[in-house]
Swiss-Prot record:
<feature type="transmembrane region" description="Helical">
    <location>
        <begin position="104"/>
        <end position="120"/>
    </location>
</feature>
<feature type="glycosylation site" description="N-linked (GlcNAc...) asparagine">
    <location>
        <position position="8"/>
    </location>
</feature>
<keyword id="KW-0812">Transmembrane</keyword>
<dbReference type="GO" id="GO:0005886">
    <property type="term" value="C:plasma membrane"/>
</dbReference>
<comment type="similarity">
    <text>Belongs to the DVL/RTFL small polypeptides family.</text>
</comment>
<comment type="function">
    <text>Small polypeptide acting as a regulatory molecule which coordinates cellular responses required for differentiation, growth and development, probably by restricting polar cell proliferation in lateral organs and coordinating socket cell recruitment and differentiation at trichome sites.</text>
</comment>
<dbReference type="GO" id="GO:0048367">
    <property type="term" value="P:shoot system development"/>
</dbReference>
<protein>
    <recommendedName>
        <fullName>Small polypeptide DEVIL 15</fullName>
    </recommendedName>
</protein>
<feature type="region of interest" description="Required for DVL/RTFL small polypeptide activity">
    <location>
        <begin position="111"/>
        <end position="142"/>
    </location>
</feature>
<keyword id="KW-0217">Developmental protein</keyword>
<feature type="region of interest" description="Disordered">
    <location>
        <begin position="22"/>
        <end position="63"/>
    </location>
</feature>
<dbReference type="InterPro" id="IPR052692">
    <property type="entry name" value="DVL_RTFL_polypeptides"/>
</dbReference>
<dbReference type="GO" id="GO:0008285">
    <property type="term" value="P:negative regulation of cell population proliferation"/>
</dbReference>
<keyword id="KW-1133">Transmembrane helix</keyword>
<dbReference type="InterPro" id="IPR012552">
    <property type="entry name" value="DVL"/>
</dbReference>
<keyword id="KW-1003">Cell membrane</keyword>
<dbReference type="Pfam" id="PF08137">
    <property type="entry name" value="DVL"/>
</dbReference>
Length: 144
């Protein structure tokens, strides 16, 4: 088999370099990958990547479509730290599940934060009491 017949390679813009791979035998999954770089050589480069895997049009519409995206961008132009996000989603009942899930997670996060705050406050008060007792004993020992 000839490699050129199996893989088609296309490039679009010079700023947006996009590569699409597809097989001539109609694969079940198609892939796309894009990279965006800044056009000025003096500024630091910013990369944005996206990757999606979907069933081809020959598959039935009842199949689930899975999407995955990844992005890496500096928070400021001078910062070297990268902010990343990655998610995998299914298209079935996504809107109702995601809203209830985010509410549940925010309630759990608030309750955990409240518990941690209470434990830290108790620990601080115990430490203060013990510190006062030790100081009192030291002073009592010196004066007796």
């Amino acid at each position: 088999m000839d490699v050129e017949k199996l893989w088609n390679h296309t490039k679009k813009d010079s700023i947006f370099q996009t590569t699409h791979f597809s097989s001539s035998s109609k694969p079940f999954f198609t892939r796309s990958f894009s990279t965006k770089t800044s056009s000025s050589p003096s500024s630091k480069s910013h990369f944005t990547r996206s990757f999606s895997t979907k069933p081809s049009s020959s598959s039935s519409s009842s199949d689930l479509i899975f999407r995955r995206s990844f992005s890496a961008k500096p928070k400021t132009s001078k910062s070297l730290l990268l902010s990343r996000s990655c998610s995998t989603k299914s298209s079935a009942d996504l809107s109702s599940k995601s809203s209830s899930l985010s509410r549940i997670l925010s309630k759990k996060g608030a309750s955990v934060t409240g518990k941690c705050f209470k434990v830290a406050k108790e620990h601080k008060s115990r430490f203060y009491i013990i510190k006062r007792c030790v100081l009192m004993l030291v002073c009592w020992h010196k004066h007796s």
